[in-house]
């Protein structure tokens, strides 16, 4: 009986409690599984509301505004898994994580518009400077896509004036006539583990799925003032997948004299892109590494200058540079695996296209060279070219492996330099290209060292209209024409190369070229070891030429004379004892078969000073007026023979005579 009375007394309280729960839970029950929740750092719910699947923006924006109020510190906004239409852009807030795991948001704007944006004047009434619009924000998971029939040419995500932003594991799908995501004026912004897939009605000229853009108000980033020249810094794109697109990630447009700094594009996968996977324009301190690029039109493009075409370049309105012309890129493109082929957007595929130059047209006048860029450890398979560089200065291209898989008729080059000087091309492997290595158009003073070129379909190494090029310690085998071919080029040094089984000559000089060769090993060529055509000048020292079908070498002048290298001589030195010196030193040397003359040089002092020519003799003895007592006379001697512009010279013989006081 007492229990019954207790139950009757408490019944109204129980009923009130359950009624309260029913009322509070009614909205959630009406939209079961379709809600947005804001929790603070302690996990306490600060906002919860239903989201209409046909118009999710009002509820989502209210949640984001709750965070933006700043009343609850750093928050997490969670959306219940499901598919939602966004008829208006939602403005992101600082100090939050937006968790979209299992969520699909569809861009259903009636006109131009995005799904998510950083704060801007249109939505908040404020102008933002620097990186002040959005800070400490993470977007996690989810899929951003377009509603059926939405072809308005808008991005899915647009960020500007932002700092410490991460987009992690989000899929961006099915863009038409725009970019999937766009970023300008960002600092420490990261896209990681994201998917970019599906793109139509765009062209190679303007179609990066993820565009790292400039903050320019008229053509590239409208509606995000202030336009204060803030550039991107420390942008990271890592472990993302780009597939079935026009282009992948990067930048085409530039402010003259301002630079995107510290961009890292690492460990991404690019496949089936019609255009370029990675586009870098005005990048400094950039790292492009460990990406896998498959079945794309072009792998990596790196621009420091573009006079015309697809790049927009902006100045201060009077044609002046906004900042200053950078002289040091300080960037590297390393350890990428690249496979390129002809596509609808790229009829001349290349693994890499590196471009600087002297500005004309819309760029303020000056030289915008690609200076101090390292390209190393890349593997390139191509139906077109490998690496093409224009106006590269003091760059290193090393340890790259380039293989051509296209038709034999294609005129392709493994590493091609235009107007580029002072670069090191080292330890690259080029296989089955028209030319393996080529310097042309005033590409002066480059060093081509320790490369391997095999199965070239023309000359393996070409030097055209370029002076002072050094080709040293390379291995060249089984090419269709020449191992090393020079045309209208001066003062080349071709040293210690191994050249085997070329279809024509091991080394060929043409059209007034001049070169010094030394210690090359040339064998098995179907014509000559070395061919020096009319009007050229060649000095050859210690080359070893064997088994070449038509002979060791030929000087193609009026007599078309064959020449052979000549062997070493031996110069006898010694010591003149105290009191025996009479002001003269008698020198003698061993005669060399085939030598027509001997040239003697002397340096006064054992370690310093220049060697100066003393005499040219046909005999094997000479009496020299030597230095004063207490000095050392250091001598060098070479044997020579000359034939139609070819000077065959023996290795240097050395001797030192110590004159006692």
Residue ranges, per PLM feature:
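Acidic Gly/Asp/Thr-rich repetitive segments characteristic of extracellular carbohydrate-active
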Residues: 42-80
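Short, T/G/N/S-enriched strand-turn elements that build extracellular solenoid repeat scaffolds
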Residues: 60-69, 85-94, 108, 127-129, ...
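N-terminal extracellular ligand-recognition/capping segment immediately after the signal peptide
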Residues: 72-114, 120-122, 144, 172
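Short glycine/acidic-rich loop motifs that flank beta-strands on beta-rich extracellular proteins
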Residues: 85-89, 107-113, 147-155, 176-183, ...
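Right-handed parallel beta-helix
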Residues: 127-272, 277
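Pro/Thr/Ser/Gly-rich low-complexity, intrinsically disordered linker/stalk tracts
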Residues: 564-594, 629, 646-661
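Beta-strand-rich modules
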Residues: 624-645
């Amino acid at each position: 009986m007492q229990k019954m009375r207790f139950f009757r007394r408490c019944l109204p309280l129980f009923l009130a409690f359950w009624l309260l729960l029913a009322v509070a839970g009614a909205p959630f029950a009406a939209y079961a599984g379709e809600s947005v929740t804001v929790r603070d750092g302690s996990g306490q719910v600060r906002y919860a509301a239903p989201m209409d699947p046909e118009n999710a923006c009002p509820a989502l924006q209210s949640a984001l505004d709750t965070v933006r109020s700043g009343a609850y510190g750093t928050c997490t906004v969670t959306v219940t898994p499901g598919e939602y239409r966004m008829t208006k852009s939602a403005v992101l807030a600082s100090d939050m994580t937006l968790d979209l795991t299992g969520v699909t948001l569809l861009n259903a704007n009636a006109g131009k518009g995005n799904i998510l944006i950083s704060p801007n004047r249109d939505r908040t009434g404020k102008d933002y400077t620097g990186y002040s619009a959005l800070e400490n924000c993470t977007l996690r998971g989810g899929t951003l896509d377009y509603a059926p029939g939405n072809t308005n040419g808008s991005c899915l995500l647009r960020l500007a004036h932002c700092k410490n932003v991460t987009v992690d594991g989000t899929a961006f799908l099915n863009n038409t006539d725009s970019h999937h995501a766009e970023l300008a004026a960002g600092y420490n912004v990261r896209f990681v583990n994201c998917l970019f897939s599906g793109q139509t009605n765009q062209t190679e000229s303007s179609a990066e799925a993820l565009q790292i853009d400039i903050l320019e108000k008229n053509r590239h980033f409208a509606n995000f003032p202030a336009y204060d020249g803030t550039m991107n810094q420390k942008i990271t794109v890592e472990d993302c997948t780009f597939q079935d697109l026009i282009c992948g990630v990067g930048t085409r447009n530039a402010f003259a004299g301002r630079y995107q700094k510290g961009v890292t594009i690492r460990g991404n996968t690019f496949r089936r892109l019609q255009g370029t996977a990675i586009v870098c324009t005005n990048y400094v301190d950039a790292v492009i590494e460990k990406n896998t690029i498959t079945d794309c039109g072009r792998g990596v493009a790196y621009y420091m200058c573009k006079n015309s075409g697809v790049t927009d370049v902006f100045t201060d309105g009077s044609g002046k540079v906004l900042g200053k012309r950078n002289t040091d890129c300080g960037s590297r493109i390393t350890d990428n695996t690249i496979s390129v082929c002809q596509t609808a957007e790229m009829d001349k595929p290349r693994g890499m296209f590196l471009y600087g130059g002297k500005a004309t047209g819309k760029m303020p006048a000056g030289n915008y060279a690609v200076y101090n860029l390292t390209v190393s450890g890349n593997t390139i398979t191509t139906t077109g070219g490998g690496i093409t560089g224009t106006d590269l200065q003091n760059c290193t291209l090393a340890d790259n492996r380039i293989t051509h898989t296209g038709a034999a008729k294609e005129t392709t080059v493994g590493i091609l330099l235009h107007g580029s000087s002072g670069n090191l091309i080292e330890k690259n492997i080029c296989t089955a290209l028209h030319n393996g290595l080529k310097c042309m158009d005033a590409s002066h003073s480059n060093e081509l060292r320790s490369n391997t070129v095999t199965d070239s379909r023309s000359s393996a190494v070409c030097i055209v209209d370029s002076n002072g090029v050094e080709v040293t310690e390379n291995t060249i085998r089984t090419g269709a024409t020449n191992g090393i071919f020079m045309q209208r080029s001066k003062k080349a040094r071709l040293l210690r190369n191994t050249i085997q089984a070329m279809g024509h000559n091991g080394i060929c000089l043409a059209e007034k070229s001049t070169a010094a060769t030394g210690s090359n090993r040339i064998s098995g060529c179907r014509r000559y070891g070395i061919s020096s055509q009319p009007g050229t000048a060649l000095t050859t020292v210690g080359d070893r030429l064997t088994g070449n079908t038509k002979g060791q070498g030929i000087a193609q002048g009026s007599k078309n004379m064959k020449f052979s290298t000549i062997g070493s001589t031996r110069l006898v030195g010694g010591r003149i004892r105290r009191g025996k010196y009479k002001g003269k030193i008698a020198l003698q040397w061993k005669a060399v078969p085939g030598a027509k003359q001997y040239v003697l040089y002397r340096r006064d002092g054992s370690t310093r000073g220049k060697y100066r020519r003393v005499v040219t003799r046909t005999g094997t003895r000479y009496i020299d007026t030597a230095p004063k007592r207490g000095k050392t006379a250091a001598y060098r001697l070479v044997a020579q023979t000359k034939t139609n512009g070819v000077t065959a010279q023996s290795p240097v013989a050395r001797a030192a005579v110590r004159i006692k006081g």
